[in-house]
Amino acid sequence: MKILVTGFDPFGDDKINPAIEAVKRLPDEIAGAQIVKLEIPTKFNVSADVVKDAIAKEKPDYVLSMGQAGGRFELTPERVAINLDDGRIQDNAGYQPLNHTIHGDGENAYFTQLPIKAMAKAIREAGVPAAVSNTAGTYVCNHIFYQVQYMRDKMFPDIKAGFMHIPFLPEQVVTRPETPALSLDDDVLGITAAIKAIVARDGKGDIETIEGKNH
């Protein structure tokens, strides 16, 4: 089994992005699965081209995209991607879409193929906070989540894909009072546990348990 794990570069006012920093620190093999790591730009459309090329080259069984969600307390596997770009800030290319449909021939939304409940449970059992999330936002995180699902729908039907958000790092909240943070070590531990759950549930679907939050 091969799993492509992507992480965004820094964006906005931050000089570091926990997503790519955690991805870079993942082992090359987890639970027997080969881990392919990829840094992607925080840019609408360009990020999708980079991931598309990597999927075509690596032919992974799974794609797990990682992104930063400042303000969240826990790692949050995402349930659904929506067909909408609505940037609260410009991306790293200076582009800020407003109420923009990502693909006119795409579904209004795509649900992940990842076992998100099993992932959240495994992360917590590893000692790291986690919960299923029902919104990936409308910035570049949702964009790449949707784009990979669209690719699966139109080009790569054999892959399974999804997205997971992680909180700020402690150094990112020094000037952000009362904002939650999680250490890089915990990020890596949590992502590793999530990937182990993906491998363990391959071909079995997700577990039946109560998960999720209002957001």
UniProtKB/Swiss-Prot annotation:
- A GO molecular function held by the record: pyroglutamyl-peptidase activity
Which reaction equation describes what this protein catalyses?
A: Release of an N-terminal pyroglutamyl group from a polypeptide, the second amino acid generally not being Pro
- Tell me yes or no: is Protease among this UniProt entry's keywords: yes
Among its keywords, does the record have Cytoplasm? yes
Question: Which PROSITE patterns does the annotation name?
Answer: PYRASE_CYS (PS01334), PYRASE_GLU (PS01333)
Q: What is its EC number?
A: 3.4.19.3
Disulfide pairs here are none
Domain of life per record? Bacteria
* UniProt keyword list: Cytoplasm, Hydrolase, Protease, Thiol protease
**InterPro entries (alphabetical):** Peptidase_C15, Peptidase_C15-like, Peptidase_C15-like_sf, PGP-I_bact-type, PGPEP1_Cys_AS, PGPEP1_Glu_AS
Its GO biological process terms?
proteolysis
Q: Which EC main class describes this enzyme?
A: hydrolase
Q: Where do the catalytic residues lie?
A: 78, 141, 165
Q: Where in the cell is it found?
A: Cytoplasm
Chief subcellular location equals cytoplasm
Q: Which GO terms describe its cellular component?
A: cytosol
- Which NCBIfam families does the protein's record reference? PRK13197.1, pyro_pdase
User: What family does the entry list?
Assistant: Belongs to the peptidase C15 family.
**How does the annotation summarize its subunit structure?**
Homotetramer.
Q: What does this protein do?
A: Removes 5-oxoproline from various penultimate amino acid residues except L-proline.
What is the official name of this protein in its record?
Pyrrolidone-carboxylate peptidase
Which organism was this protein described from?
Lacticaseibacillus casei (strain BL23)
Taxonomic classification, please? Bacteria, Bacillati, Bacillota, Bacilli, Lactobacillales
Q: Its encoding gene is what?
A: pcp
